[in-house]
Amino acid sequence: MTLIEQIITIGICIVAVQFTRLLPFFVFPVNRPIPQYIRYLGKVLPPAMFGMLVVYCYKNIEILTGYHGIPDLLAGIVVLGLHFWKKNMFLSIAVGTLFYMALVQLIFI
């Protein structure tokens, strides 16, 4: 790609990102209530995404080889414990990820 094409591509990306960030403010203005189905989606999608992350993380574990998925299961237990204790999805995922990385980098080498 030439320099001009790269600049145009970056410009298009910037416009697309800003459009998607500003779109909700135009679709759901402050003076109108948010539709009930949008509130419903805001309530059910975070746990659904959490469930999809769990399935994605555990799909390739091979119980009969290597470490038998022990680091994965321990990290999952940490995530569940933190989530039930603190009720903070970001904290649960971040600490679970750090715990898993520490296990596979330092203990299960």
UniProtKB/Swiss-Prot annotation:
It is found in: Cell membrane. InterPro entries: Brnchd-chn_aa_trnsp_AzlD. The keyword Oxidoreductase does not apply. It is a multi-pass membrane protein. Keywords: Cell membrane, Membrane, Transmembrane, Transmembrane helix. Its main location: membrane. One of its GO terms (cellular component) is plasma membrane. The chain crosses the membrane at residues 7-27, 37-57, 63-83. Belongs to the AzlD/HI_1737/HP1330 family. This is Uncharacterized protein HI_1737. It comes from Haemophilus influenzae (strain ATCC 51907 / DSM 11121 / KW20 / Rd).
